[in-house]
UniProtKB/Swiss-Prot annotation:
The secreted form is derived from the membrane-bound form either by cleavage of the GPI anchor, or/and by proteolysis catalyzed by a metalloprotease. A lipid is attached at residue 234 (GPI-anchor amidated serine). The gene is FOLR1. The keyword Nuclease does not apply. Glycans are attached at residues 68, 160. Residues 235-241 form a propeptide. Detected in milk (at protein level). Disulfide bonds join 36-64, 56-104, 65-108, 88-174, 95-145, 134-208, 138-188, 151-168. This is Folate receptor alpha. It comes from Bos taurus. Belongs to the folate receptor family. Folate binds at residues 102, 106, 123-127, 156-161, 195.
Length: 241
């Protein structure tokens, strides 16, 4: 009896050691739908948020963001990321609305599962990579921002944060957006380290993520997420970072 207990104990120890060493497995395809990423302000699970603020309101029936997060998404230098949109003078309102909508999509959407990837970052454990943004949404973003000013083409890193919010690094000159982003694809693909990849598909195709949609017509991104979850080799679900 004693030797049997010893064997069982050894097996348990080996199993525990193996489990501790085993890497976290990628999300199963069934886990790619209706999910929130493990990031700084996201809820653990999506659900109704009836009072989401202004541009974030399309996600009120099913959201990964809280009401407070949606309010902060509309503020300059908000507590979310202390990001200053006006780092090269005042950003045009028509341009800023795209960045607010971009923030709402990132914080609130439960339909980004096929593009969620693990990262080893202090402020988040997951990010999105290569989200296929509808070409019209990318085009209008670029058109409305091309006459605003910035000093960098990658806004994820390289800022001067000594003041508590982002400022242009030394020797980084302010130029119009179309200097740093000469094409719509340059803007959408590069500004957030390839979080987006501008799609050849159009809005309503069921093959690209819409940053803007009419909630009274339903959320078109649900169909898009389902398609890429079921077709992981379709070309818009990158396999690594």
């Amino acid at each position: 009896m004693a030797w049997q207990m010893t064997q069982l104990l050894l097996l348990a120890l080996v199993a525990a050691a193996w489990g501790a060493q085993a890497p976290r497995t990628p999300r199963a395809r069934t886990d790619l739908l209706n999910v929130c990423m493990d990031a700084k302000h996201h809820k653990a699970e999506p659900g109704p948020e009836d009072s989401l603020h202004e541009q974030c309101s399309p996600w009120r029936k099913n959201a990964c963001c809280s009401v407070n997060t949606s309010i902060e998404a509309h503020k300059d230098i908000s507590y979310l990321y202390r990001f200053n949109w006006d780092h090269c003078g005042k950003m045009e309102p028509a341009c800023k609305r795209h960045f607010i909508q971009d923030t709402c999509l990132y914080e609130c959407s439960p339909n980004l599962g096929p593009w969620i990837r693990e990262v080893n970052q202090r402020w988040r454990k997951e990010r999105v990579l290569g989200v296929p943004l509808c070409k019209e949404d990318c085009q209008s973003w670029w058109e409305d921002c091309r006459t605003s000013y910035t000093c960098k083409s990658n806004w994820h890193k390289g800022w001067n944060w000594t003041s508590g919010y982002n400022q242009c690094p030394v020797k980084a000159a302010c130029h119009r957006f179309d200097f740093y982003f000469p094409t719509p694809a340059a803007l959408c693909n590069e500004i957030w380290s390839h979080s987006y990849k501008v799609s050849n598909y159009s809005r309503g195709s069921g093959r690209c993520i819409q940053m803007w949609f009419d909630p009274f017509q339903g959320n078109p991104n649900e169909e898009v997420a389902r398609f890429y979850a079921e077709n992981p080799t379709s070309g818009s679900t990158p396999q690594g970072i």
